[in-house]
Amino acid sequence: MNVKFFCGKSAKIEVMKDKIRILHINDLHSHFEQYPQLKRAVDDLSQTDRELIKVDLGDNVDKSHPLSDATAGRFNIALMNELGIDYATIGNNEGIGLAKDELDCLYEQAQFQPIIGNLKDEEGQPEWAKPYLVHKTKAGTKIAFLAYTFPYYLTYAPNGWQVLDPMARLEEDLARSEVMDADLVIVLSHLGVRYDEQISETYPQVNLVIGSHTHHLFEEGKLINETYLAAADRYGYFLGCIDLTVENGQIIACQIEAIPTKDYILDLDKEDEAFIKAMREEGHRRLAQEKVANLGRKLNFNETCQLVLQAVCQET
């Protein structure tokens, strides 16, 4: 706690308020056509005297975009670095949409810290992620970040992962001495709105749940009991902005907004159009260089589906 002393007839103690801004992105799903205005929104809202923390809630990577497919998500990581993300968790698109070896090396060039508390392999916690993290602000506020992804038990297992019950893991994490010693507990949730509401109703220790997965939107946040909830839709249509004011380790003010990124579209911006076109063309160019098989002729739709199903059966 920072205090100021004023000498005179009586000493006055002024408690310094810790002002924090959290910007959050979720479920981009490689909609890179949204990136130019999303980047401008992040840059604009980063101009603040508050301490700034930027987080991504998962499902950033989606192989539906050819450049994400061709780079196994590494291009997404480069853009996240450019946005200045500090912490990120994973969604099912990273956990299931990528092969295990792809996910294991996805964050090699990341300039941010991945966090995931309910995923492990046969060796335990993934090397590329922390199970939780305590962030200490310049003013001394300790924020415990916990993170969980939706437990698709049957689909994680064939990929070499064990996904754990997020509520059980949350309860265990809340009992950790380092988490109990924190001033604030924030959950980075890729669980969906029902889980988020359950967390808020069950665990008063959690101060804030930043949500994703179900693509829900809380334009001005939500409060359940003493827990705040935030969520910013999908595809980069919104940028979440949370302004916290903390005094003596307690939240005394919380403003939650979902800012429409369409407000940051520049009319007839040729650079944006060129950027979007170039990313798609580069993805197609790289994919065209990857030879999978020599078929002799082009397969029709039914033949392609049959081939895919046969491959799935072989692997399972």
Model regions and ranges:
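Intrinsic disorder/low-structure terminal segments
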Residues: 4-5, 111, 274
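Short, positively charged and aromatic/hydrophobic N-terminal segments
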Residues: 4-12
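Acidic, metal/ion-coordinating pockets
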Residues: 12-261, 305, 311
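A short C-terminal boundary segment appended to hydrolase-like catalytic domains
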Residues: 246-316
